[in-house]
Amino acid sequence: VRVDFPNKGIVCVGDETAVVKNSLPGQKVKFSVNKVRKGKAEGRLLEVTEKSPLETGRTCSLFGLCGGCTYLSLPYEEQLKVKEEQVKRLLDSVLNKQEEAWAFEGIKGSPKAYEYRNKMEFSFGDEYKDGPLALGMHKRGSFYDIVTVADCEIVDADYRLILQTVRDYFARVKVSFFHRMSHEGYLRHLLVRKASRTGEI
């Protein structure tokens, strides 16, 4: 039906609705109900059984597994609509209570639908417990597991090259990532910035 901030899809089940994070308008999904509070159900997305007709955007090979982006499967115009509706609902809930009239002017889109990030913070970790070194983004819904996003669509080729080179180097010299539970290891984050005008990294 719609997506509320932050990424909370409102899913119809017969005459009822449930909040299922990371679901998109038009998708058919399987989910498990985690809790029901004040008559409102909240669920965890298990599987997208049928993609939305809106999902015609270009995605990377890890889309859905990686938690780095949610709306990339939608064309950029649809992404903007979803985000604009979210912002307007948030503002409505506050500004409609005041006496003065206000006008929502919309949001301004980026000139680039892909490779638009000029700063990224990648995390070191492993893709599964005791797995090989990974450098990239957190898996969707996970605080610990990391996926190496070698073909990420929201950064350009320079970022992808740096990501792969740094990961390969530290894997080769066997420097471990920092383990939150045991407080062992060293590597935590890789922050990369690129000046859009000069290309300086």
Give residue ranges: language-model regions.
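Accessory RNA-recognition modules of RNA-modification enzymes
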Residues: 1-201
